[in-house]
């Protein structure tokens, strides 16, 4: 005691003994009467008998009691339940229906059912510790005199059989339920035993006006819930490319995989009927940054221990791989996160989102601002001579960025902010301590109401940031020398409903550049803390124009810079032409070109400067997606003004050819043939080819250790279509030296 009072440090012998053995198990004991149910796979046994003071079987006391002989879930694809609930495409052994809409079950008794004296209930249970008050235990009664939150009625009665209609509430928990049929007698309650064949899935229902995800547009609904084939847009603003993707929300096991992901997230069962909470949790669980979620992000170019993001063709392998291994899947970039999330919502309704029934679509934002600290400025630092200072330039502009939109009402926001919501699973910044983003109302983003949850300010900056060029003096002070208001958020694309074409939805995110509405929106965003660049540096009287080019991988080419003098006096520009190999995120991998021409331009004239680019200068450092970024900056000697221009050039990859035998018919074998020729003088090592087709072919892959320069390969695969309609067979080729080679063949399958 004296030592402690004097501030001395106790000796080691005075310290308490170190704990030994395993740490105590963390439980809810002491703060909750029972643990919160957070697993759809957990189940509490429901007693077969609940006897009222009797200890003998009911049959010995009352031989005429009503007994259940059989329960038919009417779950075949051609039967009424799956047809009316739009779930016929799901490959599942169980009944799958949607909430807020009636489905039917047929019950056979040992004698005719008598509504006057027989009391029955169909019971639904989800998760452990089922509770009526929490909506995880729901009894459904056949008479109007007694109803619960789910409605029930007798549709038909014939002999000993009764067809009962059951309507789940439009806000019930979404997931896998267990079903029982219970009969009440004067002596107690007897119910059916647990039978897995009577389990059923209940999904969100965009066809029901009472459901929070109701979408009152049949074409949009068909595209965003039922369509398996997606198109993801990438490339650059003036050179848009397409990537096909199989969402696979109906494939066997995908729905269970999505439910497992929610279980892995420990999401309370009672929250799984709220699309706001489901999508927010999903955006966190799709990445593995802080919760061992589905996908590991990798932008390094080294994919040694996994699959390159450009190699995936669909969501099925990813979701099933995660569910079976219980480990994050390697690797992903933004479009993979968006595509797999889109499956969840269509599944969860595609957990990947379509699978669960939530209308969802993948959206691409061209020139997407990142790392801007929550303000509305993307800063590019130049030295006094107008040359870019890469050591001090921290912000980046992605050539494109993919996210998701999910359709739902937003009762937590003022009227008018429901509808499409941005949800982004790519791990960029934390939100409430986790890597997730959204749901953020698209309408709130367009109108600058970025105070509303969730993460609207971050998305607003992605589409509205100004690109500000600063000139840094030797003393460290910086002056804005040019502000570009229109570069970021140049175009926002998604797939046109039920067509294989693109749809420009930029006007859903922002008002026209320079309009009165746009100025009002930016002022509103400033009120909520988004800082803008207020200065308006004078516009230089010399313009720079960079060309739009189509260049194949491995080509030599000329890069042309046009200087336009719009003044009545001669101008001289000391220019810097810098070419870099960049990731699609705008991050520089290496610099392959540096030229410093001095250009003299006569009054009201233009002059072109040609720069030779040899393939050997960029090929050795090329990264996936083969992007070259050209930045031209300079200083006008006569005025001291700074001129700038930027251009991203995506090199064209060689083609891979896909041919499919035809005509195709359901359940008749077909053949797909892949052909590829290595156009280079060097060999391609470690080549993977992947192939799949929605409704016709499950994912397949083939490995080639080497394809020598100038040689060709042919791969033939047989498959049997399971569904009629128009679809595609998609193929990707991937190796360390060549990424993002793809091809596809459209086919129509007859019934």
Regions found by a protein language model. Name each.
Residues 170-178, 617-629, 722-730:
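Short glycine/proline/serine/threonine-rich loop/turn segments at secondary-structure transition edges
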Residues 75-124, 161-163, 539, 550-562, ...:
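Contiguous beta-strand segments within globular domains
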Residues 114-231:
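Extended acidic/polar, glycine-enriched regions
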Residues 115-117, 569-573, 681-686:
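Short acidic/proline- and small/hydrophobic-mixed sequence motifs that coincide with surface turns
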Residues 563-569, 676-680:
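Asparagine-centered strand-capping/turn motif at beta-strand->loop junctions
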Residues 208-357, 361:
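Secondary-structure boundary elements
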Residues 590-620, 698-722:
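Intrinsically disordered, low-complexity Pro/Gly/Ser/Thr-rich segments with frequent PxxP/GP/PP motifs
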Residues 6-7, 312-464:
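Hydrophobic/aromatic-rich core segments of domains that either
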């Amino acid at each position: 005691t004296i030592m402690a009072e004097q501030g001395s440090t106790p000796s080691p012998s005075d310290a308490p003994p170190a704990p030994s053995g395993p740490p105590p198990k963390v439980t809810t004991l002491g703060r909750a009467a029972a643990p919160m149910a957070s697993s759809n796979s957990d189940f509490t046994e429901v007693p077969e008998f609940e006897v009222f003071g009797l200890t003998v079987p009911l049959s010995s006391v009352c031989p005429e009691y009503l007994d259940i002989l059989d329960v038919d879930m009417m779950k075949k694809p051609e039967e009424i339940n799956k047809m009316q609930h739009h779930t016929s495409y799901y490959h599942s052994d169980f009944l799958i229906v949607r909430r807020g809409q009636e489905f039917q079950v047929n019950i056979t008794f040992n004698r005719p059912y008598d509504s006057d004296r027989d009391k029955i209930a169909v019971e639904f249970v989800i998760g452990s510790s089922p509770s009526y008050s929490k909506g995880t235990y729901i009894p459904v009664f056949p008479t109007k005199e007694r109803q619960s939150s789910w409605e029930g009625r007798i549709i038909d009665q014939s002999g000993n059989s009764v067809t009962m209609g059951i309507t789940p509430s439009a806000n019930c928990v979404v997931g896998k339920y267990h079903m029982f049929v219970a009969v009440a007698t004067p002596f107690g309650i007897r119910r059916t035993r647990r039978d897995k064949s009577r389990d059923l899935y209940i999904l969100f229902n965009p066809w029901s006006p009472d459901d929070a995800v109701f979408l009152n547009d049949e074409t949009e609904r068909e595209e965003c819930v039922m369509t398996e084939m997606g198109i993801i847009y990438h490339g650059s603003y003036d050179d848009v490319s397409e990537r096909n993707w199989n969402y696979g929300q109906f494939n066997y096991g995908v729905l269970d995989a999505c439910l497992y992901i929610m279980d892995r997230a420990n999401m309370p069962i009672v929250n799984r009927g709220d699309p706001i909470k489901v999508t927010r949790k999903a955006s966190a669980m799709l990445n593995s940054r802080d919760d061992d979620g589905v996908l590991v992000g990798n932008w390094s170019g080294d994919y040694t221990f996994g699959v390159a993001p450009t190699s995936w063709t669909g969501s099925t392998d990813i979701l099933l791989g995660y569910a079976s291994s219980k480990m994050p899947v390697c690797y992903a970039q933004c479009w993979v996160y968006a595509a797999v999330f889109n499956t969840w919502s269509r599944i969860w309704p595609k957990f990947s989102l379509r699978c669960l029934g939530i209308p969802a679509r993948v959206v691409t934002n061209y020139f997407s601002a990142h790392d801007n600290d929550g303000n509305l400025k993307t800063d590019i630092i130049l030295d006094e001579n107008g040359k870019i200072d890469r050591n001090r330039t921290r912000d980046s502009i992605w050539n494109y960025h993919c996210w998701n939109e999910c359709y739902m009402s937003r009762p937590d926001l003022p009227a008018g902010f429901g509808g499409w919501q941005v949800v982004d699973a790519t791990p960029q910044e934390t939100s409430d301590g986790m890597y997730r983003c959204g749901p953020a109302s698209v309408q709130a983003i367009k109108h600058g109401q970025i105070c509303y949850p969730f993460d609207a300010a971050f998305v607003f900056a992605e589409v509205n940031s100004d690109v500000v060029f600063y000139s840094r003096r030797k003393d460290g002070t910086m002056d804005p020398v040019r502000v570009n208001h229109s570069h970021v958020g140049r175009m926002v694309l998604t797939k046109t409903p039920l067509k294989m074409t693109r749809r420009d939805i930029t006007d859903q995110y922002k008002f026209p550049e320079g309009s009165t509405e746009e100025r009002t929106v930016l002022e509103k965003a400033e009120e909520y803390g988004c800082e803008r660049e207020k200065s308006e540096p004078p516009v230089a009287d010399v313009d720079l124009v960079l060309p739009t080019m189509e260049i194949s991988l491995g080509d030599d080419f000329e890069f042309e810079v046009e200087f336009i003098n719009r003044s009545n006096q001669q101008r001289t520009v000391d220019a810097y032409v810098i070419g870099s190999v960049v990731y699609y995120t705008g991050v520089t991998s290496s610099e392959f070109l540096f030229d410093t021409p001095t250009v003299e331009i006569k009054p009201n004239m233009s002059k072109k400067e040609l720069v030779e680019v040899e393939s050997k200068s960029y090929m050795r450092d090329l990264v996936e997606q083969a992007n070259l970024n050209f930045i031209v900056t300079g200083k006008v000697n006569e005025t001291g003004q700074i001129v700038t221009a930027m251009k991203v050039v995506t090199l064209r990859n060689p083609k891979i050819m896909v041919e499919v035998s035809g005509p195709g018919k359901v359940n008749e074998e077909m053949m797909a043939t892949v052909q590829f020729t290595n156009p280079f003088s060097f060999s391609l090592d470690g080549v993977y080819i992947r192939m799949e087709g929605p409704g016709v072919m499950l994912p397949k892959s083939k490995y080639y250790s080497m394809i020598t320069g100038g040689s060709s390969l042919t791969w033939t695969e047989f498959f049997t279509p399971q569904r009629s309609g128009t679809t595609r067979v998609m193929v990707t080729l991937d190796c360390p030296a060549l990424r993002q080679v793809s091809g596809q063949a459209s086919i129509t399958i007859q019934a």
